[in-house]
Regions:
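Phosphate-binding site recognition
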Residues: 1-210
Length: 210
């Protein structure tokens, strides 16, 4: 199925990617609003490290991320089975091979709140590394999640270690009618409106029916 809509969201993310300085961008919104697919579209023409976190332990998350890093060419795969800590793992982002096209690397952490759940110190670790290392790297890091109140309070709020570090914030809202209607080119105008209204009534998220 063709990717429909989200033009403004993609434009905002692409503009962040083309900025000269390193980027730390937060993308959030309710579940099934289209965050992951939008990020997949963003990543299509870029060298990307896409890590989809799961509801797992810290050790399991680190093992999965380590495998992804080693596959991307990070040093250490010959003598490490996995990174011992998130501090070490995130530091190694700066040692990944430079993109072959001469551009910057895109690093996406999808469902980041799962990582914080398994290791509550992670926001502090990321803040320290961003301040001293990562903000000077040729990277765009995207922190994505569905736990909206958690992201707004624990990651973006004034009491968060990451407060003031975001270079971009995208709160994704439900797909507007004119975009959603494109999924049903053969529907009458009335049927398109009914399908959209039915979905809003059920979940407040049009993309669920689409």
């Amino acid at each position: 199925m063709a990717f429909i809509g989200r033009d403004d969201d993609l434009k905002q993310l692409q503009e962040c990617f083309t900025e000269r300085r390193a980027q730390l961008v937060f993308v959030y919104g309710r579940r099934r609003v289209g965050k992951t697919e939008t990020l997949i579209q963003l990543a299509k023409d870029k060298e990307t490290l896409f890590f989809a976190a799961q509801n797992a332990t810290k050790d399991e998350q680190l093992a999965s991320f380590s495998r992804l890093m080693f596959e991307a060419g990070a040093p250490g795969k010959d003598y490490l089975s996995q990174y011992p800590s998130w501090e070490r793992a995130l530091t190694e982002l700066t040692r990944l091979p430079e993109p072959s096209d001469g551009g910057r690397r895109l690093v996406i952490f999808d469902e980041f709140p799962y990582l914080v759940k398994s290791d509550p110190s992670l926001p502090s670790v990321l803040q320290n590394l961003w301040d001293h290392t990562l903000r000077h790297a040729n990277l765009m890091i995207v922190i994505c999640g569905s736990a909206m109140s958690f992201i707004e309070k624990e990651l973006l709020g004034e009491k968060s270690p990451l407060y003031g570090r975001a270079t971009g914030i995208l709160k994704m809202l439900p797909m507007p009618y004119w975009d959603a209607a494109q999924f049903f080119p053969n529907y009458s105008s009335e049927d398109k409106a009914l399908a959209y209204a039915r979905c809003l009534f059920r979940s407040a998220t049009p993309l669920l029916v689409l």
